[in-house]
Amino acid sequence: MKEVGIVGYGSDLPKYRIKAEDIAGAWGKDAQAIKRGLVVNEKSVPGPDEDTATISVQAARRALSRAGINPKDIGAVYVGSESHPYAVKPTSGIVAEACGVSPDFTAADLEFACKAGTAGMQMCMGLVGSEMMEYAMAVGADTAQGAPGDALEYTAAAGGAAYIIGAKKEEFIAKFNGTYSYTTDTPDFWRREHEHYPKHGGRFTGEPAYFKHVLNGAKGMMAKMDTTAKDYDYCVFHQPNGKFYISAAKQLGFTEEQYKYGLLTPYLGNTYSGAVPLGLSNILDHAKADDRIFVVSYGSGAGSDAFDITVSDRISEVVDKEITTEKLLESKKYVDYAVYLKYRGKIRM
């Protein structure tokens, strides 16, 4: 299989935020205890005109801008999410049409809880690496929901990032050295048809779910590449909250200097399918040539996708072609709990 790499990337976040204090205050909870326990201070809130499709389109357009390619050369578009706006109507078709991708392409909406975006990246790697097409695009985005008063309400957020995969080395922003996946049937988090909000296994979502899959996915990737944490400059993991992320990083031997740019949850919340793609985009915004990045996603149900990536010298040419993830994080407007309920459609008669 041919070597493949990232030739374009872009991210998008809603402007609105709500602080943990506002959510806790509405339910008579101790905000400081919640912030300490989750390592989450605030989260993004999509506006009434924002959904997974609009976020995906914006991220994809920014990825195209950085790639500098003709969108009609893209042969596949995949959008991974657990909050597609339609039960029957593909988000991927909306994204492709809005970005000017030719009708001569394949598309699909993907679901695997929070790792649907990285699953799409793997599919793109295979299609481009096998020379079935010149370029392929994968998007991971969500506008996640948590039931009012549930622990998820402090973290379930919105955002996403897009990646264009190609095989021309001179176009690489970063090269994929390898990928590895670890998957089981673990029912830690679920939502049935017609239910408004997901259910979760509480403490069961930790050791037998998140940590089992992230750590085994990471160890499998390192064994495949014959590496340790010391071989990487940066790392990013799925981040349902800041506490799990930091614990996983430290258990694998990574330092704060290595994991800090990938950790967005304290300021953004959990963007589900967008979490690892967004963390990776922020790392790329700060990286330099030859930096090596370790990536592990996680999706409830459950599985992890891991990647070993090396940044190319082209990164310095493309970062400033579009708004960075850090600037999107800094551009924000706070809303109170009442506005949050209205924007998220949580007021039901």
Swiss-Prot record:
Q: What is its EC number?
A: 2.3.3.10
- Which UniProt keywords are present, listed alphabetically? Acyltransferase, Isoprene biosynthesis, Transferase
The highest taxon in the source lineage is Archaea
Q: Which CDD domains match?
A: init_cond_enzymes
Q: Identify the residues that bind (3S)-3-hydroxy-3-methylglutaryl-CoA.
A: D30, A31, C114, T155, T205, H238, N270, S300
Active site residues per record: E82, C114, H238
Q: Which NCBIfam families match?
A: HMG_CoA_syn_Arc, PRK04262.1
State how it assembles. Answer: Interacts with acetoacetyl-CoA thiolase that catalyzes the precedent step in the pathway and with a DUF35 protein. The acetoacetyl-CoA thiolase/HMG-CoA synthase complex channels the intermediate via a fused CoA-binding site, which allows for efficient coupling of the endergonic thiolase reaction with the exergonic HMGCS reaction.
- What is the protein named? Hydroxymethylglutaryl-CoA synthase
Q: What is the lineage of its organism?
A: Archaea, Methanobacteriati, Methanobacteriota, Methanomada group, Methanococci
